Amino acid sequence: MKVTVLVGGVGGARFLLGVQHLLGLGQFARDDARDPDAHEVTAVVNVGDDTWMFGVRICPDLDTCMYTLGGGIDPDRGWGHRDETWHAKEELAAYGVQPDWFGLGDRDLATHLVRSQMLRAGYPLSQVTEALCDRWNPGARLLPASDDRSETHVVITDPDTDERRAIHFQEWWVRYRAKVPTHSFAFVGADKATTAPGVTDAIADADVVLLAPSNPVVSIGSILAIPGIRGALRSTSAKIIGYSPIIAGKPLRGMADECLSVIGVASTSEAVGRHYGARSGTGILDGWLVHEGDSAQIDGVEVEAVPLLMTDPATTAEMVRAGVRLAGVTL
């Protein structure tokens, strides 16, 4: 079975662990598997968070997925490298290097240095990611949504000057924690970007396409902003099943509610499902999973309520199983 998943960072990576647990891949590979090549997982990963910082290219969501599936993630934070140290960050601070609100761990820095060296040598991000994954063996194909620049920027009212300005998503998220007056999001470069090699084929050839319960605005929304992806979703023969990132009016994790508020979408499972829309209309969904106790009525979309708390890979695997079942695919 071929499963293609659209994902963001921490939540998306944990969802991918559930996919692998269900299919017996990656860390959950079984020695007695009849056919270890029977299943294939491809993750189309958000690149809107990517940025140059301290002279290196940082790809937070790609790295979080790579570290998580490769067993190198910091289990407490859910991002960054396990057993991290912060000597480089301390030295940069001692030199007074800005920005002082963003820190890179020493082990994590090695990843960024290798990536930046390869990018400067002319390799596209998709090839760089493949090379980095050779070290981690994540058990899934990780594809950046695009090799081109497609960064999420945020229009805010500057708290110091009271004037409107656009800042990179990382500054809004890390420095301001989304707690400044916010007016809009812009996917800079997305209109001129193209999908990375393999992305549209992964969607077209899939047996099922899953939208992880990642942020619908700055993760999934950023992916959908890249020309060609929405069209690939609308034309694939696979059923497209989405997972609500909202449980009882609150985000599963992160600050999805803050992002939804900016674009005028309520923080409910139904509102987010309607935001994605039905593929029978002009949207992208065939099915929509909401948390037990929640409900949603979306014309043209089959809705089912199941437990959506990703407490561990085994529990998350049952979420994935429910989505595959809703798509009518037999494991």
Swiss-Prot record:
- Residues reported to bind 7,8-didemethyl-8-hydroxy-5-deazariboflavin: D63
Q: Tell me what reaction this enzyme catalyses.
A: enolpyruvoyl-2-diphospho-5'-guanosine + 7,8-didemethyl-8-hydroxy-5-deazariboflavin = dehydro coenzyme F420-0 + GMP + H(+)
Q: InterPro entries under this entry? A: CofD, CofD-like_dom_sf, FbiA/CofD
Q: Which Pfam families match?
A: CofD
Q: Which pathway, per its entry?
A: Cofactor biosynthesis; coenzyme F420 biosynthesis
| Recorded superkingdom | Bacteria
The cofactor named in the record is: Mg(2+)
Q: Which GO terms describe its molecular function?
A: LPPG:FO 2-phospho-L-lactate transferase activity; magnesium ion binding
The Gene Ontology biological process annotation of the record reads: F420-0 metabolic process
Q: What is its EC number?
A: 2.7.8.28
Keywords, sorted A to Z: Magnesium, Transferase
The record's family statement is: Belongs to the CofD family.
**What role is this protein assigned?**
Catalyzes the transfer of the phosphoenolpyruvate moiety from enoylpyruvoyl-2-diphospho-5'-guanosine (EPPG) to 7,8-didemethyl-8-hydroxy-5-deazariboflavin (FO) with the formation of dehydro coenzyme F420-0 and GMP.
Q: How does it assemble?
A: Homodimer.
**What is the official name of this protein in its record?**
Phosphoenolpyruvate transferase
Instruction: Tell me what organism the protein belongs to.
Output: Mycobacterium sp. (strain JLS)
Which lineage is the organism of this entry classified under, starting from the top rank?
Bacteria, Bacillati, Actinomycetota, Actinomycetes, Mycobacteriales
Q: Which gene encodes it?
A: fbiA
